[in-house]
Amino acid sequence: MEPIELRSDSRHVLLAATPTEVFAAMSDPDRVARWWGPDGFANTIHQFEFKPGGRWLLTMHGPDGTDYPNESRFTRIVDNQVFEIEHLNGHHFLLTLELVPMDAGTQVRWRQTFDTVEHYRRLAEFVAPANEQNLARLAAEVQRGKRAA
């Protein structure tokens, strides 16, 4: 198998929040619907079984009105530490979000891993900015949750 570094988009962001506050935004389907996806996208979540092996079905609504059905399976969940899904339809990938406590908050480590280097390279120009936007939307949702608390 090809090295994971060559077939993954990896990035991280430091959020001024506890791992518990960040995980709350990742584990509540209503909150996930607000931050999931790149800028301009909205989401309808049809099923969100937040447990290892659980199904996650959603439709992402693009800014141009195009609907993108998505099917994923939660592969690993560790409260306040890890959220991992396998995306099953369309482009197959594994997405891992790790929460690392830091003095200034929580570092979110995001890694989207494709099956092959070729698959990743075909999508890299879209994936990189989309993942940056996704993390920015997660950060905004975490802050929104802190204000509401």
What are these regions (language model features)?
Residues 19-20, 51, 75-80, 98-107:
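A short, structured loop/turn motif at beta-sheet edges
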Residues 22-26, 32, 56-58, 74, ...:
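Hydrophobic pocket/interface hotspot
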Residues 44-86:
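Glycine-rich portal/gate segments that line the openings of hydrophobic small-molecule binding cavities
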Residues 84-133:
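Beta-strand/loop substructures that line and gate deep hydrophobic ligand-binding cavities in soluble
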